[in-house]
Amino acid sequence: MTVSTVGVLLALGSVPGLTDVSSAQSGTVDTFKSDSALHHAAHRGDVASLQRELDSGADPNVTNRFGVTSLSLACTGGHVEAINVLLTAGADPNQASAAGETPLMVAARTGVVDSVLALLEHGADPVARESWMGQTALMWAAAERHADVIGPLVDAGAEVNGRTNSGFTPLMFATRLGHIETVDALLDAGADLHQTLPDGTSALVVAVINAHYDLAVRLLERGADPTAAEQGWTALHQLVWTRRPNTNKNQHNPSPRPRGRVTDLELVRALVAHGADVNARQTKEPRDGYRNLLNRIDATPFLLAAKVVDLEVMRLLLDLGADPLLTNEDGTTALLVAAGVSVWPNESAGSNEEALEAVKLMMELGDSVTTIDDNGDSALHGSVMRGGKELTLFLLDQGATLSHVNERGWSPLTIAQGVFYGNLGRRFPELETVLLELGATSPPQPDLPK
């Protein structure tokens, strides 16, 4: 058949599966996508029109210019009867789009169980992967919270512990979304509760990252290990970060809102009740994208809570047995970080008022305002870094050294005069005046580090 012949037949409405472009009401040829009348009928779930087109000789496997079949469109809408009509007419359940997307993946994403069952009964491949990310139908079901679809797919041979090209699993998809029913369905189907992402992150930590605290408790109840730290830190460390991220200073980027009934403080108790070590030491630095100046190697959850002056968590961890005097590998104490050592102005969480209260708490616990860490930083360096006048005066009243010079060659006065990390030079004129009046001195200002 020549192109000109097709044009004539189109004008007469005589090509099976195609209709006149002008007949908008009857399921037309889409000149952009080249959808056929069969595509339109499948998309609407219009079984009568679908059957009429097939009876007229329409090819059940015809694709539009994007490689999409009528079967995939029927699966998108969850039109079970239309799916069965197409399969009976010979539609290929494994015909994939250009990106490797199969009808079963589409049906799993939509979540209609009968659609999935119909495809599987006609030979749909449950382990097929799309070519972009290497995802399977089971992953799509998990990512869309379709717990009812999990069992049929796994029973048909879907890989419950399969991984995407980047190492994500169905369980991790469901955990990231916090859907307990889907997580339970995957675990009941054989998903490995102790699996990790390639960097060692456990499902428990993924739940905590996303503030899915109800799910975190559920994972603990099912046997998740609260001491797991293959990625370099535990769920308890993660909870401190999730509760008060670096960008929380001015509430422009608030913490994730917990989903469900379990609060973050209740989760702290649950983690410890299930065996979490309140004095666990961090072994790696996270690549979380937040600006951080503290060496977190050897940091405990308590030290991290002190860094963001989260007094509620600090006190709770103390009640649960935390040692408040443990330091990081630089010898930086909880009092030092609470005072402001390693803060990033306007981004580090916590107010100056909270910092003062936290410093007083640490003094009650035996920490000292005269401690100097291995970087030469003192509590007074920290209080000036965070611009806390009342805190600075309190520290001086308690005996803090006025003009100690750290390893960078900075005294507290140097910082008040505007020398700071990287390309950030923030000056604190009021503190500069206070320090000068008390006799503070400053060494010659060094070049800013490159």
Model-derived segments and spans:
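Bacterial N-terminal signal peptides
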Residues: 2-17
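Ankyrin repeat boundary/linker residues
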Residues: 31, 64, 97, 130-131, ...
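N-terminal segments that cap or nucleate solenoid repeat domains
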Residues: 27-66, 70
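Conserved ankyrin/ankyrin-like repeat signature
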Residues: 49, 81-82, 114-115, 148-149, ...
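Ankyrin repeat domain, specifically the short helix-to-loop turn at the C-terminus of the second helix
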Residues: 54-59, 84-92, 117-125, 151-159, ...
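Ankyrin repeat A-helix N-terminal signature
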Residues: 40-44, 73-79, 106-112, 140-146, ...
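Ankyrin-repeat-protein effector appendages
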Residues: 21-37, 189, 222, 241, ...
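Start-of-repeat signature of ankyrin repeats
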Residues: 34, 67, 100, 133-134, ...
